[in-house]
Amino acid sequence: MLAAIALSAALQNAVQANKTPAAEIGVVRSGKLIVDDAYGMADLNRHVAATPQTQFEIGSVTKQFTAAAILQLKEKGELNLTDPLGKYVPEYTQGKDITLEQLLWQVSGVPNYTEVNHFQHIAGSTPGGVDPALALIAKKPLDFKPGTRFEYSNTNYILLGAVVARVSHTPWETYIRRNIFERAGMSHSGFIQDEPRLPDTATGYARAKNGKLQVAPPLHGPWAGAAGGIVSTVADMAKWDAAFFDGRVISAQDVALATTAHRLSSGKSTGYGFGWFVDKKAGQPEIAHSGGTFGFASENEYFPTLHEFVIVLTNVAALDAGFIADQTFDAINPQIAALENKPAKGEDPAITALARQWMHRMQTGDIDKSQLSSAFAKHLTPQMIGGMKQGLAPLGDPTSFVYRGKSKESGSTAYQYSVGFKGARLDLTIAIDGHGKISSLGIGSE
């Protein structure tokens, strides 16, 4: 009883520390949903409190469902993962030779339609769908030769949704509802375009540049579609996780395939399977995906050696869901969390000082491109710099900076750190090339 009270207090503190309007938090341990609690306000203006029945947009966690749909059709013999995209979506001529598995693995080179200029305005003011999404990138060449590198693109899964619809002769949403929601018992899930008819959908918020919350811009559901269009609850997401990993949605063999990180021809792991990232948190194997829309963020995390799931749904477009998931993991695994403050061996103080400097630069937007490789300097657009500042500045100064180790990546050495803040923890990766220039920076929740 006391442990449950302490856990509830820790979770409520996590939500309040991040100033999250509302969060629904779930913990599944050994097949039982032991935590399904809601905190905060689903609608600030109308003073509606969040409950376990409140529905949230899950964003890119939707990709797990789309990948499962493709694998179901593969199991029925209706498609092959090595089929070329042109067999199903011939109108996208640049991608005609890309295979379905390259889309699933995010190694296709297809440009990301959600990164075009003014996308937020477009997606809130015009009807969406596969055709409008493809129109945004129709004149763009592939970003790289398919199969040669990993680069996350929402377009990959919009295209896979089109494949599901055309092979099954039914809209993607209808297919997901009939073949996944109903099979898993997900009676409180739907799609963004259903929200006006759903009784308990939260209002989404975004943080303005001054940090204040404001109602998020509108999003026409089909713009998110198969890449991020599902609305759900923690209880339903727990049902999805159970059905998926128990082999009730796809075969056990395909579950293993979907949750195994792909390796490029170079042997380098991409850290991504079919709609699932494959990584570690606090030294524990983790199979997970995060999600975000204009006004929501989510985390769906599975720790196979611990037999635990952590599910977090929030109604703010920020890093809050990842922070809260970290704090939830720490609260239910205090002994493992204690190990997070022990640095790895072989730390280089000069590199750590550089990493600290660049954490501050990302928070302030003060980017010195002379320290970057030419390729990375070109890649780091003003929009990306502004986005980093907006997301990281509210965290304040780091309270801890722990070295986690290093690895070789494409001619560079990548150094990993766990960076603590008041109420949050992030992973920071800084890669240094052979000329001493920063070739990449990675930031995310642990």
Q: How would you name each of these model-derived features?
A:
Residues 8-58, 78-83, 139, 214, ...:
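Short, conserved catalytic-motif segment at the N-terminal edge
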Residues 19-22, 294-297, 424-426:
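Short, small/polar residue-rich loop motifs at catalytic or cofactor-binding pockets
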Residues 43-44, 96-294:
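Short, surface-exposed loop or secondary-structure junction motifs
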Residues 285, 314-383:
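Short, gly/Ser/Thr-rich active-site loops of penicillin-recognizing serine hydrolases
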Residues 289, 299-316, 428-429, 438-444:
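Short, well-ordered beta-strand elements
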Residues 366-410:
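Short solvent-exposed beta->alpha transition segments
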